[in-house]
Design a protein with these regions (language model features):
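An N-cap/entry alpha-helix motif that binds or orients negatively charged groups
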Residues: 2-82, 187-223
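Residue-level signature of catalytic and energy-coupling elements of molecular machines
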Residues: 33, 90, 111
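Glycine- and other small-residue-rich loops at beta-strand/loop junctions that grip anionic moieties
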Residues: 42, 96, 100, 120-121, ...
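Hydrophobic faces of well-ordered beta-strands that scaffold small-molecule active sites
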Residues: 88-91, 116-120, 139-143, 167
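Alpha/beta enzyme core
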Residues: 95, 109, 113, 130, ...
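Short secondary-structure boundary segments
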Residues: 122-123, 171
């Protein structure tokens, strides 16, 4: 958080000194435009699932072990034949450049430094080659089952060429959810943040602002 996106009205505060995610969220909210914060932080409908997810994670705690030798403990694991230094990776999230100009290259680089997997979204705002160049670790790609099967096949082929080794297929969105925060802000992607791995002809409505509507929601319904 030492460097933040300041070109759209934000400031550059000092980042949190520890790993508390609440502090990270507060620092992000202080610098992100309100519509971007709503897109990143919000959920669908009444956000019941969002709250339930957070409550589930809040129940997880670490139980320390005392008076035992923990010098040889390792968090390493293997997933799909790839070695991970820790048993978790970076989940797919769209448009990282909304939060930072480096976007997914920074996220992939962080995963690589940690020695774990980076999963890119089909709607990443950095190219497959850029993300692949940022990490030597395992790379996966999340995809939606697009109506345009030729485009989907092309995306998968280019990701494979860039060294992405697994596909994460999203199957739980037969209906595009209503996101009240996005509707309230008329959320629209800025022109300089694009899904660069998809044909730009598919992305036009995601950049077309309409009062009281989410351009992302409208675009998703069309695809």
């Amino acid at each position: 958080m030492a460097v933040v996106w300041v070109e759209r009205g934000g400031t550059e505060p000092a980042g949190p000194d520890d790993g508390d995610l609440g502090d990270v969220a507060a620092a992000a909210r202080a610098v992100l435009p309100p519509d971007v914060w709503g897109f990143v932080q919000g959920g669908s409908g009444a956000e019941r699932t969002l709250r339930a997810n957070r409550a589930a994670y809040d129940k997880v705690a670490l139980r320390p072990r005392v008076l035992v030798d923990v010098g040889a403990i390792s968090l390493r694991t293997s997933v799909l034949g790839a070695d991970w230094a820790v048993p978790f990776g970076v989940a797919p999230m769209a448009y990282h450049r909304l939060a930072h100009p480096d976007g997914e290259t920074a996220s992939a680089g962080a995963a690589g430094e940690l020695g774990t997997m980076f999963c890119a979204s089909m709607f990443a705002s950095r190219t497959f080659a850029e993300m692949a160049g940022a990490t030597a670790g395992p790379r996966w790609l999340q995809v939606y089952y697009l109506r345009d099967r030729d485009t989907l096949a092309d995306v998968l082929a280019r990701a494979e060429q860039a060294g992405f080794g697994a596909i994460v297929l999203t199957v739980d969105t037969p209906h595009v959810a209503t996101r009240p925060r996005d509707l309230g802000s008329s959320f629209t992607l800025p022109d300089d943040v694009r899904a660069v791995n998809l044909p730009q002809a598919l992305m036009g409505t995601a950049h077309t602002a309409t009062t009281g509507r989410s351009a992302i929601q409208q675009h998703s319904r069309e695809r």
